[in-house]
Amino acid sequence: MIKRLRNYWINRTTRRRFLLGTAGGGFGIMGAGYAYMRLWESGWLETTRRNVPLKQPGATIKVLHLSDLHASRVISLAYLRRAFGVGLEMKPDLICITGDFITWKYKQYDAYAKVLRALSDHAPTFACLGNHDGGSWAEGRMKIGTSSSQPVRDLLANANIRLLHNDHTVETINRREINLVGVGDLWNDECNPNTAFAKLDDSRPTVLLSHNPDSKDLMRNHPWDLMLCGHTHGGQVFLPGLGAPLAPVKDKRYVRGLHQLGDRWLHISKGVGNLHGVRLNCRPEVSLLNVS
């Protein structure tokens, strides 16, 4: 009887230790995974280079495409400065930023403008606004955004970055004239392509800046050759076999990379910043497009 009781307590203690050890190991793996997503991959910049042959061939223009900077508590200006440095090392001729300069309300605008100015000091720099940059969606989201995009507009002006908000302009780069068009954000109900493309001379190649790739459906009947987008963060969490289930778009076919749509091209940046400071199988991206 005594022997049976001793074996019972030994087995029970061993089982308890096993269960506690297994639980501890599981929590350890989870902790290590979270640390990887937050402390490593979220700041592990990836540089991509892609060729974009337009239907109207001409001199090659090197376009640096940046998106979703998301300056915030978790995305520091020091990190953005480093990302810009990586991009400028590729010696772009033109820089395009497709929105979400901030995440919610922001205070360090003067310091931010100085960091952004490194871009415009190097090459002509253009931008459109994203859903976090102010508007009806930004104001309504948990009441920590703002209804006005004026602070971000002022930021861009102070950084010598030209905002294209339902507007277009003509730029000559490497002796090649191109149209640059920018539209307002889809989620903020400010995307107005009819205004943006009004009186556009479509004999020139046209590069379109629009934060949300779902807006492509509104652009179907307008003349553009290359559309630059962000918004998705590439899904931010990319799972084998599942793709990017968290990507905030209706059309999950287009969440990252370069896509050919007939004789047009769509490029979606995975973004430089992120929300909540984490990424998984989806490194932040600095893209150079060789547009020819």
Annotate each language-model stretch with its function.
Residues 54-63, 161, 169-180, 260-265:
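Beta-strand-turn-beta hairpins that frame and shape the catalytic cleft
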Residues 137-161, 165-168, 173-210, 216-217, ...:
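Binuclear metal-dependent hydrolase catalytic cores centered on His/Asp/Glu-rich metal-binding motifs
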Residues 66-67, 95-99, 125-131, 164-166, ...:
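Active-site neighborhood of phospho(di)ester-bond hydrolases with catalytic His/Asp-centered motifs
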Residues 3-26:
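N-terminal secretory signal peptides and thylakoid transit peptides that target proteins
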Residues 24, 28-113:
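N-terminal active-site segment of His-dependent metallophosphoesterases
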